[in-house]
C-alpha cells in the first residue's frame, strides 16, 4: 500500500510540474523522483539522501544545506542553483550539470562524479579537489 502511495505521489509530481514553491527542510529521502521538476523552488535544508533523482531538474533552485548523500542523480541539472553547504557524500553524479551553480562548501566526499559540467572555480569553492572521489573524470585539469 505504501509503495502504491509513493508511486502515485511521484506521478502527481510529474503530471503537475513544480509543486513545492517552498519546502524547506522537507524529507524526500529514499524517494523515486526520477524526472521530477524542482526548478526555481526553495528546498533549502531538504533531505534527498538515497533518493532516485535520474533526470531531475533543480535549475535555479535554492538547495542551501540540502543533503544528497547516497542519491542517484545521474543526468540531473543544477544550473544556476544555490548549492552552498550541500552534501553529495557518496552520491552518483554522472552527467550532472552544475553550470552557473554557487557551490561554496559543497561536500563531494566519495561521490561518483563523471562527465559532469563543473568549472574550475566551482571545484575550488567546494571540496572537490581535496576528497577521495570514485572515478572523477577531468579532475586533474580542474584541480591544477
Question: What is each model feature region?
Answer:
Residues 1-9:
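Bacterial N-terminal signal peptides that target proteins for export
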Residues 8-16:
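Bacterial N-terminal signal peptides
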Residues 17-144:
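Tandem repeat scaffolds
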Amino acid at each position: 500500500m505504501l509503495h502504491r502511495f509513493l508511486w502515485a505521489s511521484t506521478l502527481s509530481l510529474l503530471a503537475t510540474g513544480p509543486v513545492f514553491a517552498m519546502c524547506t527542510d522537507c524529507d524526500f529521502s529514499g524517494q523515486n523522483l526520477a524526472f521530477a521538476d524542482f526548478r526555481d523552488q526553495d528546498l533549502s535544508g531538504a533531505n534527498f539522501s538515497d533518493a532516485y533523482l535520474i533526470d531531475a531538474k533543480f535549475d535555479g533552485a535554492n538547495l542551501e544545506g540540502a543533503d544528497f548523500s547516497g542519491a542517484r542523480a545521474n543526468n540531473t541539472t543544477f544550473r544556476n542553483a544555490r548549492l552552498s553547504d550541500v552534501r553529495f557524500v557518496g552520491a552518483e553524479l554522472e552527467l550532472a550539470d552544475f553550470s552557473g551553480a554557487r557551490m561554496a562548501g559543497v561536500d563531494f566526499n566519495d561521490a561518483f562524479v563523471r562527465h559532469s559540467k563543473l568549472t574550475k572555480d566551482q571545484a575550488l569553492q567546494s571540496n572537490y579537489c581535496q576528497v577521495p572521489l570514485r572515478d572523477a573524470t577531468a579532475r586533474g585539469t580542474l584541480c591544477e
